[in-house]
């Protein structure tokens, strides 16, 4: 992991190029959505507006390369839109094809990783891949808002150094917990996963071994899903990708 806290965010923003402007912003109950004339990106809606935004006039009309810098904002509502802007650039069908990252429905982001005997940490209330709990030695779920059986996220500093595989929700990019989580996971295989995850190769040089996320292919469908605050995950409106270091 690079020692500079914001190195990861700088690497993410540096890869966003061109002058494509943002044409629409939508804040749903669960997802923040950024649209351009040709693309769309998501970021998990994250409460937290006590700090003034980096862009007081908002992100509407800004080019994606500028708006993506807001991922580093400590105004977490703005940061969700910043990551959505980055995803509108990175998570496109054309990029998926160019990088060869399509992950078919019957495969999972842990493909090729032997789960037997592993000590696994899961950041965020996720189920993980099928068979994980049968194969692994131990599975710890760590959650900011813990449910029954989850550890509170304060336990990360104790549990994660014991793990050799850690699955991390993409929303950790937005709430700024990711840099420290990666420090705690320096001896583990790390997978950043979820619809908020950008298909950004530079992040693989920042302590992340795998990036697993969503490329939206049904733009009208996902837009209605976000605006109507529909339940369920958004993967039915696109294709999964897996970008890995190995």
Protein language model annotation of sequence segments:
Residues 121, 165-169, 191:
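Structural motif
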Residues 102-108, 145-155, 173-175:
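Active-site glycine-rich loop that binds ribose-phosphate moieties when present
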Residues 81, 87-91, 119-159:
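Conserved mixed alpha/beta catalytic, RNA-binding, or beta-rich assembly cores of soluble enzyme
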Residues 115, 132-135, 158-161, 182-187:
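Short, conserved loop/helix-junction motifs that constitute active-site signature segments
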Residues 131, 177-184, 202-203:
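A short acidic, amphipathic alpha-helical/loop segment
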Residues 1-127, 226-228, 242-246:
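Electropositive, gly/pro-rich neighborhoods at or near active sites that engage anionic ligands
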Residues 190-246:
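C-terminal functional extensions of proteins
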Residues 138-140, 178-195:
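A short, gly/pro- and small-residue-rich
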């Amino acid at each position: 992991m690079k020692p500079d806290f914001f190195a990861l965010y700088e690497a993410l923003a540096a890869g966003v190029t061109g002058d494509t402007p943002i044409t629409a912003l939508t804040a749903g109950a669960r997802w923040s959505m950024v649209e351009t004339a040709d693309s769309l990106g998501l970021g998990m809606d994250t409460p937290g507006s006590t700090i003034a935004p980096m862009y007081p006039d908002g992100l509407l009309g800004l080019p994606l390369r500028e708006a993506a810098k807001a991922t580093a904002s400590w105004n977490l509502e703005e940061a969700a839109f910043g990551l959505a802007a980055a995803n509108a650039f990175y998570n496109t069908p054309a990029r998926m094809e160019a990088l060869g990252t399509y992950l078919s429905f019957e495969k999972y982001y842990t493909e090729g990783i032997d789960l037997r005997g592993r000590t696994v940490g899961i950041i965020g209330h996720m189920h993980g891949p099928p068979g994980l709990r049968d194969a692994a030695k131990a599975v710890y779920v760590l959650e900011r808002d813990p449910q029954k059986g989850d550890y509170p996220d304060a336990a990360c500093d104790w549990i994660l150094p014991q793990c050799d595989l850690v699955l991390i929700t993409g929303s950790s990019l937005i709430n700024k917990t990711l840099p420290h989580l990666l420090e705690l996971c320096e001896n583990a295989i790390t997978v950043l996963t979820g619809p908020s995850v950008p298909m950004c190769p530079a992040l693989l040089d920042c302590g992340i071994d795998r990036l697993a996320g969503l490329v939206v292919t049904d733009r009208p469908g996902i837009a209605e899903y976000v605006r109507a605050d529909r339940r369920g995950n958004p993967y039915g409106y696109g294709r999964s990708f897996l970008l890995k270091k190995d």
